[in-house]
A protein has these predicted regions:
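Generic N-terminal amphipathic, Lys/Arg-enriched alpha-helix
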Residues: 5-21, 290-291
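Short catalytic/ligand-gating loop segments at beta-alpha or beta-beta junctions
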Residues: 223-228
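Alpha/beta enzyme core
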Residues: 4-12, 27-53, 60-79, 84-220, ...
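C-terminal alpha-helical cap/extension of soluble enzyme domains
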Residues: 238-239, 250-322
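Basic/polar N-terminal segments that are highly enriched at the extreme N-terminus
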Residues: 1-3, 322
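Active-site oxyanion-binding pockets that recognize sulfate/phosphate
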Residues: 20, 104, 294-297
Length: 322
């Protein structure tokens, strides 16, 4: 099966009450871990590449890695998506370079300018058979080159979504309902403490999501910054020389609730980084004599695979939906 767009994928997800996992990729082991889990669970998947990943690994290397995944996992639909395209030129480069989906993120611009930039990308993308994700509202946090301070973040305004989608022609819309980028999604003072002494973050703004869905019936919604920051991997990192105090993510039950509504794409990046980093730190700490990268990248890949499997089955609900 060749690379596909997300159009049919999202239509099935919307009707079926599940979401597609959009996992950020940076190297071979991450691509392998994700796609092997999806192949075994018969789940559709979006492999997404940020501007930072393209700078790190090179556009051509990443495309070829994804093409290899397509060849090795022929039974599942795979989308190659640009995450947080900052401008028309970056989106055009990815469209011309084999991507089947791009995101134009002009959410920091004034509303009218966001429409103008997004529409330009949509027109070029649709002429080339590529779909476009846009964004309204701004998430706090840090992801590669996307840096937004908490005081600059803003929830999506539901009263703007109909005009935005109508004027831009975008195929899906990322909204801001309380998620944020990175492993430090919430400050301790924003959280409550449960009976086990664990910090519990504030709930997502499902009222905003439901109002957006009411105004855009049948339209696919996207959640960015949706890593749950598994505490076992945070502990693994901290136990083996790392320093990640108060790393807090989005509770998985809230993501499952969002997937049952109109959210068709859920972005996950930090969880993969935590799994890989924790595994490698533990291996290095326990085996100080080892120096073969294959020896520590192999268990890192295996843990990424199991993490993704858990997301597909227990969080996204997309296992068996390929």
């Amino acid at each position: 099966m060749p690379l596909v767009t997300s159009k049919e994928m999202f239509a099935k997800a919307y009707d079926g009450g599940y979401a597609i996992g959009a996992f950020n990729v940076n190297n071979m082991e991450i691509v392998q871990g994700i796609t092997e889990a999806c192949q075994e669970e018969h789940a559709p998947v979006i492999l997404q590449v940020s501007k930072g990943a393209r700078a790190y690994a090179n556009h051509t290397y990443l495309v070829k890695l994804v093409e290899a995944a397509v060849a090795c996992c022929p039974d599942i639909p795979i989308v190659l998506h640009l995450d947080h395209g900052p401008d028309f030129e970056t989106c055009k480069s990815c469209i011309d370079g084999g991507f089947t989906s791009v995101m134009i993120d002009a959410s920091s611009k004034p509303f009218a300018e966001n429409i103008e930039i997004t529409k330009k990308v949509v027109e070029y993308a649709h002429d080339h058979g590529v779909v476009v994700e846009a964004e309204l509202g701004t998430l706090a946090g840090i992801e590669d080159e996307v840096k937004v301070a908490a005081h600059e973040a803003s929830y999506t305004r539901p009263e703007e979504v109909e005009e935005f989608v109508s004027k831009t022609g975008c195929d899906s819309l990322a909204i801001a309902i309380g998620t944020s980028h990175g492993a430090y999604k919430f400050k301790p003072e924003q959280c409550t403490v449960n009976e086990k002494g664990i910090l519990v973050p504030p709930p997502l703004r499902f009222d905003v999501l439901k109002e957006v869905s009411r105004r855009l019936p049948g339209f696919p919604i996207v959640l960015h910054g949706s890593s749950s920051v598994p505490q076992d991997y945070v502990k693994m990192i901290n136990d083996h020389g790392g320093k990640m105090p108060n790393a807090i993510g989005v509770p998985e039950e809230q993501l499952r609730q969002a997937a049952r509504l109109s959210v068709c794409k859920i972005n996950i990046d930090s969880d993969l980084r935590l799994a890989m980093t924790g595994t490698i730190r533990q291996f290095m700490d326990e085996h100080p004599d080892k120096f073969d990268p294959r020896e520590y990248l192999k268990p890192a890949r295996a843990n990424i695979k199991e993490l993704v499997r858990h997301k597909l089955v227990d969080v996204l609900g997309c296992a068996g939906k390929a």
